[in-house]
């Protein structure tokens, strides 16, 4: 029996109006082969733990042979890119293959990135290169390990197909899994095209599939938007707390369910630099690290405008007004956890602000600082103080911090243990990703495999991987990444 017959597969998105997508067959790569396979995620969907155990997996997921249970399609959407509306967007190199149910009965999209040209490719070749595919695979799993809402990576395939970017590279494929691939830009496309019947139908389906609790409400569309605002605020609060810069927060890269989506020129902070720009095409710093909360609101406002045929302006405004309150609440909660604080006290915001100021002024590594702080008590303050150039200012802050901790009436051991569970020892620094890419391009996937294992449990000590916690070398700091992928 074919493996595809044993899985719970469907193609419900293809039941939507055809102006939302185009059926496109994948264009196979040469000599395609597995590079990575996410065993834990595969198990969740009743897929084999070893992809080599069934040749149909490679031929089907790579697009060489399209199983009858698949219905490959490229989605049509629009979006605001760097603040300007662009109606000519869509899946230019990715295809939604099918939807699959996990063991709990939840439905997930299976999306193949790098599958070839589509009607929405514009001048692109429809391919993804190994370099960018490795980055997305690693980062989506790193974000999952950090507990941040994200799409997932099920597998990665390599090939011998040459793909030209700044120079010749090899084509690769990413199997992305997500609860949905509906973006803010889907609603923008229908709204600006004045396709209001289809616009309402998409909203109805999104509520049915992803916000079923809204169905019993008198105004399900307004409740859905409230939920989108809340989830987006929560996602961005997580980004800011862990030091993640997305790099290209266009509305077509915003998930309707608040999951981190479309990993491109992302970066994690090394030194705490609020204005960090990871995308070298972002000349104005629109998507700088410290601008992400503001851009989240801008994008939600764009979505609100696109949903205005369904929701009263007063309801939209009320939801948008809650965004900053929600984001600040989530962020403050996350920072209290990172600092080992249980209760909410009046001076906490100032404690956080003074910490960020001190980190920025002294160019202190953000991840290293919080991990070291997870081991601080009155007997080993010096380890933290030594991270700073201005040691007097650091000593004063540490003293204030310890005084604040003493108000919690919790043992030092208990506090430190909880802090180590939320402050990662390991993050996907750009230089680590680059080292894995360099080796993979030579056919050595050992670094990729090691990082994948490590980033799934970034809070553990992993003594055998200690060197991955090292600060970046000079060449690896403040790397700006191209959108070219």
UniProtKB/Swiss-Prot annotation:
Keyword line: ATP-binding, Magnesium, Manganese, Metal-binding, Nucleotide-binding, Nucleotidyltransferase, Transferase
UniProt KW NADP keyword: no
Catalytic activity field: L-seryl-[protein] + ATP = 3-O-(5'-adenylyl)-L-seryl-[protein] + diphosphate; L-threonyl-[protein] + ATP = 3-O-(5'-adenylyl)-L-threonyl-[protein] + diphosphate; L-tyrosyl-[protein] + ATP = O-(5'-adenylyl)-L-tyrosyl-[protein] + diphosphate; L-histidyl-[protein] + UTP = N(tele)-(5'-uridylyl)-L-histidyl-[protein] + diphosphate
EC number: 2.7.7.-, 2.7.7.108
InterPro entries the record matches: SelO (IPR003846)
Superkingdom of the organism of origin: Bacteria
Molecular functions (GO terms): AMPylase activity; ATP binding; magnesium ion binding
Alphabetized Pfam families for the sequence: SelO
UniProt keyword Zinc present: no
Binding site for ATP: 90, 92-93, 113, 125-126, 176, 183, 262
Coiled coil (residue ranges): none
Annotated binding of Mg(2+), by residue: 253, 262
Active site, per annotation: 252
Cofactor section: Mg(2+); Mn(2+)
Record's function text: Nucleotidyltransferase involved in the post-translational modification of proteins. It can catalyze the addition of adenosine monophosphate (AMP) or uridine monophosphate (UMP) to a protein, resulting in modifications known as AMPylation and UMPylation.
Protein family membership: Belongs to the SELO family.
NCBIfam families, per database record: PRK00029.1 (NF000658)
Protein name per UniProt: Protein nucleotidyltransferase YdiU
Organism whose genome encodes this protein: Aliivibrio salmonicida (strain LFI1238)
